[in-house]
Regions:
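Catalytic core of membrane glycerolipid acyltransferases/transacylases, capturing the structured
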Residues: 24-77, 120, 133-136
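Catalytic-site beta-strand/loop segments enriched in glycine and acidic/polar residues
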Residues: 85-120
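A cross-family acyltransferase "interaction/gating" segment
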Residues: 16, 108-164
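Generic beta-sheet signal
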Residues: 73, 98, 126-129
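Membrane-anchoring hydrophobic helices of lipid-metabolizing enzymes
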Residues: 1-42, 68, 86-87, 147-151, ...
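Short, charged beta->alpha transition segments
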Residues: 59, 79-87
Length: 165
């Protein structure tokens, strides 16, 4: 039932890309923007690594229903789980990951995305999201939940991130 309600919410959002998505690429986003990015990049042949936590299980089920190729992993296991994303990039598909990982600190990039982009010689895209109307959760990452019929603007930058990672 929750997945059905979430899918209806996603369908109500008006999503606009400031510029086209380059593929294949490592798509780096902030954990706070996961709900909007999940909706924005649906059915675009993207592989994602999702935590094995309980929250990750719920998120993985929704992501799979939106056309994502899901791999479950743990940040405590290091890069062993990233091999699936590596293979996806080598085969010409994109890989998405939260730059600040599953536990944060929020908005502090970890090295995994940069490593993956360097090893596969694919661009690392920094995704920033703007919302017309959204709630913010009281969680470690202050997740944005766009309200019904919110306008979501996806900003794709492949220059800035290279300068600070």
């Amino acid at each position: 039932v929750l997945n059905f309600i979430l899918k209806l919410l996603v369908l109500s959002w008006r999503i606009h890309f400031e510029k086209p998505l380059i593929q294949p690429a490592v798509i780096g986003l902030w954990h706070q923007d996961l709900p909007a990015c999940l909706a924005a990049f649906k059915y675009k042949n993207i592989a994602v690594l999702i935590s094995q936590s309980g929250d990750g299980s719920k998120f993985a089920k929704l992501a799979k229903s939106l056309g994502y190729d899901i791999f479950r992993g743990s940040s405590s296991k290091g890069q062993s789980e990233v091999k699936h994303l590596f293979k996806a990039l080598i085969s010409g598909r994109s890989a998405g990951m939260a730059l600040d990982g599953p536990r944060g600190p929020a908005l502090i990039a970890k090295p995994g995305a940069r490593w993956l982009a360097d090893k596969t010689e694919t661009p690392l895209l920094n995704i920033t999201v703007k919302y017309s109307h959204a709630l913010r959760l009281n969680s470690w990452d202050k997740t944005f939940i766009p309200l019904p019929f919110a306008k979501i603007t996806i900003l794709i930058n492949n220059e800035t991130l290279d300068n600070w990672l």
